[in-house]
């Protein structure tokens, strides 16, 4: 990391030194043209890169005026496969057409793990020092110094190690296979809180182990107590094939639910719990057949789950544990009607008959207001400076005009060392165009966004993870929750209009104690978030460039503008870390929730209930 950091520090965006030669990468959508000699190239001599960048930006701008997508013609990748790919065949036994031979059982009130399978263990846990299965980094021990605030009645004492009790013994075996040595701060508290039967609202900095924070205690309690009796079926025989999960995890995007499912497979390995995943954009018939084979822990995107409930394929009558991950993003994306339909209108046990856990890196007041309907006597857990960034991330803000962004990015990539680089842009067409430019400059890159098919997105993510294409250009679809090992550099090519999105984007690096670098291209078009950006840098003890201070002073003449400010409740971002029950005054009326649906970036909330539409989020 020091090599990369030194390279970035010494980077001169006006440097005319030619980049080192790279092997030509030909993506599948260009393979035919390359074979026939009809491929196009936008390459320019390295010693005139800045002028070439301006020309490319001009082409990019014109493509919008002409309603053209640019030269990026199609989706990347031709199918599922590869290590850990989400193939619909035999995926370690969990998706096969037969019972996984390593699956455990629950007999006479006791959990009986299944036999070990070395091939499955290598597939889902990797081997020691496998870079694709990154765990903790050199700064992980610093997490012990992070302040933790837990508020509520009778807060259980935190744990300091993975032990039994409170964790079930077989879960400890799987945690050891995953090479997790000690709990993160959020896990130290969440495990005893859930074991005590309490509800939880947990806020923790991104990369702090939130997924383990809910999977560990939920699976542990499931292993201890076993499955619930399945209700006796009634009605036609063909309606009997219905899943009755005991745990439900809701998350906003396909990528995040897929990632949580992959983690659930690890920690449910050889247990009686069979995890399943459902999300839009994939074959619903295959998903229905999969859950019919047994589903004890269901990870789901809200829209697809509503569809399966309506089809009579999933019942929520047996739910003991409900987890809402990235709850603020689900509301921003307009999922509140679906979430309320799932929790309050689908036969799920009421708030007093289940445990409910809400996890996210930010919990603004409108989400805490939602908690009064979904949680009972909950514990509010704030780990570190929630809504801020990790000091493991070195943040650099460069002043770059729009017309110079391409050349600036090319210079950064030329100086980059080993590791993965994630580049964020604001638009889908912008992602495709920039990816095409990078490929024409011999940088192996791919892209993901909401218009890509699920097959193409999974393939692109897999090739990014394994380093085949170490540069990924992404829109906000990849910004929240994804845990991709070895992302050493995040570039905000286009800064978002919401500072929380910035926090989540750069949180793709510097995870679990590892270090990373985040570079942002800033100009006066981003003055709406300049004050909050300065606050973020100061909170993480980063350098604040003079041009940010100057822009902030200029913006002050126009009043205290800025981004969304998380609902404008009057305290800005810092108040999103607090338990509003301590402040008194109540939460107001339920009618306030009507304004939460349909964030400005995602359209109206009602569109997410239309399963027949061309919707990329459910």
Swiss-Prot record:
Residues 71-96, 558-573, 595-612 have a biased composition (Gly residues). GO terms for biological process: cytoplasmic translational initiation; negative regulation of cytoplasmic translational initiation in response to stress; regulatory ncRNA-mediated gene silencing. Keywords: ATP-binding, Cytoplasm, Helicase, Hydrolase, Initiation factor, Nucleotide-binding, Protein biosynthesis, RNA-binding. One of its GO terms (molecular function) is translation initiation factor activity. Residues 37-46 have a biased composition (Polar residues). Residues 55-70 have a biased composition (Low complexity). Its EC number is 3.6.4.13. It is found in: Cytoplasm. A motif (DEAD box) lies at residues 325-328. ATP binds at residues 204-211. CDD domains: SF2_C_DEAD. Residues 1-116, 552-618 are annotated as: Disordered. Residues 191-381 form the Helicase ATP-binding domain. One of its GO terms (cellular component) is nucleus. Residues 392-552 form the Helicase C-terminal domain. PANTHER family: ATP-DEPENDENT RNA HELICASE DBP3. Belongs to the DEAD box helicase family. DDX3/DED1 subfamily. The Q motif is unique to and characteristic of the DEAD box family of RNA helicases and controls ATP binding and hydrolysis. This is ATP-dependent RNA helicase DED1.
